[in-house]
């Protein structure tokens, strides 16, 4: 199902219709948290388990799921190999399993994650539980791989176990008729971007691959009178949340961002998505461009190119797969950075500051990110660029002091403290993880008011408060090994590098279509295994072809006109049959004669014509 196609409904509605807990497996912690908050806001019991919450909280969530107090349980794929989770799972009444971003299980996909291969172990534990795999971007090869890796057909519901059971593959069309796809080659991308933003009214997203460039580009646009801000994974979580809300609420027109922005963003009226740099694959481009026009109204997806893009694209392929010796060096530096010795570190989840790491060990962030991805695919670690860590609170006054008038507590402060004490029992002894959305609902506060109230209590030295934040983390999935023994398999490096090149070639093909090329919608649909019966008629290729055809027709019409005028230029009457000797069709000649008569350039007497 394409981006914005309503994937959540496909499992939420059927799961609500039956008893039991629905387990949703997703790699996107930020999206996981947003989904949980949305469900809770409408009164549906939902929880998420990830590395940003305490062990005690995880145990509490799992116990609640066992006793029926949780309807939707969101977990990361790494959680499926956790002993505590598997032990508790045995006692749950699981009614449904949903695999989101299912393309991550396929090595043919653009975002392969080895942890997804563990999902099949869950199927062996719960063989009769229905399983739904969802993705917005899957080629036919990826779809085939998903059905094989998840062994659809081998695990049939008990009531039809005696019959052959085949997987049902449902696919919505990838065609987005309301989106006009455009590739534009220009000398100055900044100038062209500003021109496009002024010509298309409404909200826009501008994607660029460089964090520094987001800030520079946003500043340039603001100087030109355009209302913009910027967003990337390196920003403080509070700033990211604020800017996201400003953009969604219409206070900001243009969001300049890296691809860290967009997952889980549900804004229907985005009129324009512009890419300043070419994405790595058509899957990525289609997903990001598809954030435009979810309301069905006319929208635009524009890719800006210049003469240097092909060279930089080729260089990017090399950067995505740095030499194995470099990957080993990054691994060593990570272990030094976290003070992890040989044969230790398994299971450790540690906060990772990319900028500090790169400065300390003289690396470039893009190279480190590529190395981390390879180490993750080789199953040495898990890198989460945005790990959602819940807010934490500890009361630092004695219980009897809470009623002391000297504290001058406001109504909101008193109400919030009472609510906290009602639901959390460790506030006086530990920094306790709290659920912001749940408490806001109980206190009838907005999130901003809730945050302001806790900050006020912190300033009065009543509590210690650490706001919710999204921080990068690295989890070591095995003990540290000597880098000489670090193995990066062929399937992780050479094979994936080859598939990366193949996807890049398709993206270059998309960029390269000219007036004689393939309709962009047709090319995209063909890539995803879908046939378009006729060209879209709206992309820049189709429009250029239509203009060229019109110009050609006008040119040909002028040639016929000149040939007729030359024949009649002697001023003598000519029989109409002589015109056939000019070599043009009867329709073209008839149309030309009618034009000349309308212009009063010739007269006709029966079958004879004379130039006036």
State where each predicted segment sits.
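Secondary-structure transition/turn motif
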Residues: 4, 611-612
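Helicase motor core with emphasis on the C-terminal RecA-like subdomain
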Residues: 2-8, 14-23, 30-404, 411
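Intrinsic-disorder/low-complexity peptide segments enriched for small residues
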Residues: 26-29, 609
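Short leucine-rich amphipathic alpha-helices used at interfaces
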Residues: 8-9, 427
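C-terminal accessory/connector segments of nucleic-acid motor ATPases
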Residues: 323-592, 599-604, 610-611
